[in-house]
Amino acid sequence: MTIQCKVKSIQPLACNTYQILLHPESPVPFKAGQYLMVVMGEKDKRPFSIASSPCRHEGELELHIGAAEHNAYALEVVEAMQAALETDGHIEIDAPHGDAWVQEESERPLLLIAGGTGFSYVRSILDHCVAQNKTNPIYLYWGARDNCQLYAKEELVEIADKFANVHFVPVVEEAPADWQGKVGNVLQAVSEDFESLENYDIYIAGRFEMAGAAREQFTQNKKAKSERMFADAYAFI
């Protein structure tokens, strides 16, 4: 479904990463974990995970877009959003999309794994589960190059402190001397912490290679069930 949206705000979150709030002309029914397509042209639609959960923000849609200078694909979208904001114009989106939404009926513990701005996908799921007062154990592993890119770290620490069933583990490749989290690869960190993933619902967002490696490693080495692993990437790989 194609919908016109006003761009409500654009805020920098971290190095080259922006939070964008969209206000659609009509409500967009979506499930936590789905994505939208920003329509840049008739045959040019670009996918971004919806970072907000369906039960919040009074119909607003939140995006987190990583737009480094070398990433023209995302940078052009941010520039189009900026132009719409400055001229009080519209952005066109096509939504909702994706089959990797949260399995609300499941009572299994959740393992949420994000690489970089893949965090927006797991944030929607976490936010939704917390808002719905779900009591399933939730483990969120967020990997990034450095601490600067973990732009929601303080928010996640607060959520984990407030809700006994939520556990947050930050993972960076380059750690400062006073670093309190894990160092290295996010999939390696998960492998070190879990003997078995047999009983988990696993949600993954990041590069396609990471999602593919997770499916291979976790099903072969950690007894994960491939049918209980969810990622947008799995529709393509």
UniProtKB/Swiss-Prot annotation:
SUPFAM superfamilies linked to this entry: Ferredoxin reductase-like, C-terminal NADP-linked domain, Riboflavin synthase domain-like
Domain of life per record: Bacteria
EC number: 1.5.1.-
Transmembrane portions of the chain: none
GO MF terms, alphabetically ordered: oxidoreductase activity
Enzyme class: oxidoreductase
Domain FAD-binding FR-type residue range list: 2-103
Cross-referenced InterPro entries: FAD-bd_FR_type (IPR017927), FNR_nucleotide-bd (IPR039261), MRET (IPR050415), OxRdtase_FAD/NAD-bd (IPR001433), Riboflavin_synthase-like_b-brl (IPR017938)
Family (UniProt): Belongs to the Fre/LuxG FAD/NAD(P) flavoprotein oxidoreductase family.
PANTHER family: NAD(P)H-FLAVIN REDUCTASE, NADH OXIDOREDUCTASE HCR
Protein name, entry field: NAD(P)H-flavin reductase
Organism the protein comes from: Vibrio harveyi
Organism placement in taxonomy: Bacteria, Pseudomonadati, Pseudomonadota, Gammaproteobacteria, Vibrionales
Gene label: fre
